[in-house]
Amino acid sequence: MIRAVQENAPGIDVLVVDDGSPDSTAAEARAAGARVLRHPFNMGYGTALHSGYCAAMRGGYDRVLQMDADGQHDPKMLRHLVAELDRGTDIALGSRYIGRQAPRSSLARRVGTRFFSWIASGWIGTRITDPTSGFQGLSRRALESVVNDGFPEDYPDADVLVQHHLRGLVVREIPVLMHERIGGLSMHRGARIAYYGYKMLLTLLLMPIRRPTPLRSADTVARTSA
């Protein structure tokens, strides 16, 4: 995966966030030429993302391209995310549901996706078809928006997109190719689906009265985070 990213985005700096994996992920990623940020134990998807964002902030990067490492996200699509950022978009969201045949998923996943797509679209004012997509490009403004003490530790999906919009950032979807997962397990499975639905719905319903997290500036959060 790392070499495919390097081939399709020459000159890009690759960071792998190893969320406490018990295997040789970190060593293999380094051998492939990536920088590795390793958690001492599994801290959750949201925390892994936040660690990567903080590292990008500390490094002074103006853009971040975010993708999963389970084979779903096609590195050939990275240039499309970059092109959308070039147009002035703050969050370029790769959607598997625009103009392509989406990979197979469970009925519960499809129903949940449509429901939260409807809610996110209503909040943002533009159609969002894939609110759970982790295939994204972020501008510097978007990076500063997610580096905060209130970033979700578990499932940062539709709620984060809505927060971006409320902060005046431009969110746009673009069609991307996604594949069947070749490794690992979906976060949206079993009892986790019920928890995800409950947590996400509650978060979105409370959005009108939720106060911004005031604690520390983005620079301070980035400097003091893993």
Please state what every model-predicted region is.
Residues 29, 85, 163-165:
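Hydrophobic residues within well-ordered alpha-helices
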